[in-house]
Amino acid sequence: MEQMRVYIANLGKYNEGELVGAWFTPPVDFDEVKEQIGLNDEYEEYAIHDYELPFEIDEYTPIEEINRLCNLAAVSYTHL
């Protein structure tokens, strides 16, 4: 299985015309996301702008769900 990763962007900054985001490898730690892409009281929302995963997600898939699905994919792959 290829490396799974997601590109998470600061949605507030994106809407202001500035691309602030980073690639993360699951399991994604939300505190790390907040620190790396500048989520705070002013910029609270994020969006998934790209991904390399063996399943489909959308831009508003919660990080917890991405982590859960990645765990299932990894477990399934090891049992092949």
Spans of model-derived segments:
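Conserved small/polar residues in nucleotide/adenosyl-binding loops
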Residues: T78-H79
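Polar/charged, Gly/Pro-rich intrinsically disordered segments
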Residues: A74-V75
